[in-house]
Amino acid sequence: MLKRIRAIFQIILLVIISIATSVCQTNNKTTALWLFDEQIGFYPSHVLEDFSDNNIPLVLGLGGQIVEGKFGNSLDPINQERISLPKGEEEFGLKKMSIPAGRTIEPLSWHNAKFAAFMTSGENHLRKEIGFRKPTTTKLNLGDFDWTVDFWFYPYRKTFEEGVLFEIGTGPRGENNYITSISLEHDLTNFKLVNYASDNIIRLQTNLSMNEWQHVAFVYDSRSNSLSHFINGKKLSTVQNIRLKELDIGDEDYMSIGRDCKWQKQFQGKIDELRFTEGMLYNSNFIPSQSLSPYTNITQKDSLIKGPILLAENRNNTFDIGSRKHLFIDNLLIEKSENIKFVVNPPRKGEVVISDIEGQFRKHLTVVEDEKGKIRIYNSAEKDYLEVFISDDGINFTRPNLGNQIKGNNNYCILEPVGGLGNPFIDPNSEGEGKWKYITGYHSRGTYLYTSPDGFVWKRMKLALIPFRNGTQSCTFYDDQRQLYVSYHRTGIHHTPGLATERASVVTQTNNLLSPIIYKPLSQSEYINIDKKERIRDPLPWWLDNGPLTPGDWGKEFPVKFKPDVEDPIGTDLYITKAIKYPWAPDTYLAFPIVYFHYYNDGPITRHELENPKRERGSGPIETQIAVSRNGLDWNRFYRPAYVGIGKHENYDMKTAYIAQGMIKRGNEIWQYYFGEPHYHSAHLKYDDKRAVFRLIQRIDGFISIDSPYSTEAIIITKPLLFKGNRLMINIDTEATGYAQIGFLDTNNNPIRGFEIDNCVYINGDFIETEVEWIRTSDGNSNYEHDNYENLEAFNNIITSSDVSSLEGKEVKIIFRMKGSKLYAMQFKNKLD
């Protein structure tokens, strides 16, 4: 019996041991995971993302390319296409620098940035804004603790010297041998680990096959002081009795992937999914896992919500408007008109809703109605973290307690430097963890997607949606009529005639926000050709603009859809687009561009004088205008009156007016909000205690109207239409002494019996929605004599009708006759008598 128990125990023990031998303890922690899944053609200076929780980014250099990989893409330490470098500033790496006294290595610039992938806390003469980590303070600094380094490798070239997989050093770069590195000898027979701190140089025999993907792993066991090497899960070699040591923390520490610190010793092939782990992942043979790309439980509906076909895409002479509401923001449906004008209707300025602003407070606000009908205002404040205010009535806003306290306030929902560079919105195509979305800049390293189940707790997708850095708020909306997510992002690639930055916006479109948006890389020669036709700022190519350690700004890779035009004063910027799809009528896209009038560079000296510090102004004032579109891409901007101008408001004398992204519907009103300051952009004299957020009140559908003059009648005849419904409803304001009449015509412009414009009951008054009526005699005859009624009894012979069902589905035109009136919108509806 005892022997049987002992045998069973031995079997159990063997099972436990066998389970433990292939994959080690479960408390392993990923230090860094670079998937290198950025797009092929990825520009140098742009960020290679770390998919661990430690946020350790790299940047791509002139000595590396993103190419096809084992899983997605990979890093190949081969040179980028050669470019001719323009002259420029030291900060942006365009000036070749002399070797400093006491050193031997030329400081980093575009002239020598031949690294493949790199991070550094040195090279501080350059612009560095992406949040590099100090590698010697992390577990990338391999030493006397359990660790694993593994990756997929595709060797396809042999070299005359060893090739470096990675090198980490205390710095200054290239000035000493204080490094830890793993390299592959030139004949591909041995890997070599160099650990300066422990004075170890360790060779591990390998067995690589050329032109094949292989999984490579190195595992250090600090208990046995051994280092093992695996190929495709098979242990090939182990070195015993070594004691590694971490490097000292360096003031100018760095890490280079694919080359050494002098950008030499090119690794012999492609690297995919490079991972550093604190802990031993393997201690015996194993089967390599598939891709390490993290699984996400954020999903998008298989079929995107689809709205009606855009009227603007109509290819026939007849427009089938069905029962959709039509806002008169342009002449899309107009065939002929006389004496009309499209007019901007600025909102009524309401009360202050957020005041007593202290400290940092970004101008770029977003207003959203949440699932419970509460109104939220998002913006960034301290440290560029995102905060939120909440209101039941849209007037009294409070700070919700989200448990993230910064300087006494608990309403912060993203504790990362996002700068308010996006607009949180509810995605109609997602539920659960991805219901809320926020596309924003992050750490000046690119444009990223954040997701949230409730708009309070957010998570950033690791891979940038687009790798270009944001300088201000990106504006995103879902277009149900084109089934695309549309985003506008500011670019500064153009310059004014006076060589100042001319700000405009590019547009991106995608049907899947969970995957990066791919762009077509532009070569230097392509940029030079563009520069012959447009005023393009130096340097060319544009991705050089921030230096080799900070990503480039938005360039010509995406179409520019919002920019200053010939009507604007010279030296005017379109700072932010603020584009939306109007939620309460199809075919209607509105933008509220923030327009910035520069005092400097352009125009005469009499204009430049306004920036004189003695005047205590600044670089210029800012207003909000309005633009309209029928497809969200092609815009018509109205210059005057300004939609939200500068001037007096609630005892504030505002010099800048930044409207918030988004709007709220309450009854027959649209509420918008804006941030105002009583000082100028780049102010010489600031009044930070007088900054405030205000409510704006707009008539529903009332942004633009067709106005008719007071002195004479105006006429509008539409193009041929098909409609669905039995009533024609009009949003109109005639004031007291204006009026309108409406009739129907056939396609030959003949009046349709019973719906003649002369028989239309005068529309007189202010109506959000009023039925159009026609009069007839009691015998049904509409051909009565007008102006023939001298007493009230005559009206007994008159009946009115608003029923247009007899015209439903027939090709008709609508004729409007107006005087002293504003026409906003129309809609056919079905209504029971």
Language-model features: where?
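Beta-rich carbohydrate-recognition and catalytic domains
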Residues: 297-576, 581-654, 673-833
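Aromatic-rich beta-strand patches that line glycan-recognition/binding surfaces
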Residues: 46-52, 150, 160-175, 257, ...
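Localized edge beta-strand/strand-to-loop motifs within extracellular or lumenal beta-rich domains
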Residues: 212-227, 819
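Short, aromatic/His-centered strand-loop micro-motif at the edge of beta-sheets
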Residues: 191-215
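Extracellular glycan-interaction patches encoded by glycine-rich segments
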Residues: 122-124, 249-273, 280-281, 286-287
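Extracytoplasmic low-complexity segments
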Residues: 23-127, 240, 284-312, 338
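Glycan-recognition/cleft segments
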Residues: 163-193
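Short, solvent-exposed beta-strand-to-loop segments that form ligand-recognition rims
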Residues: 231-253
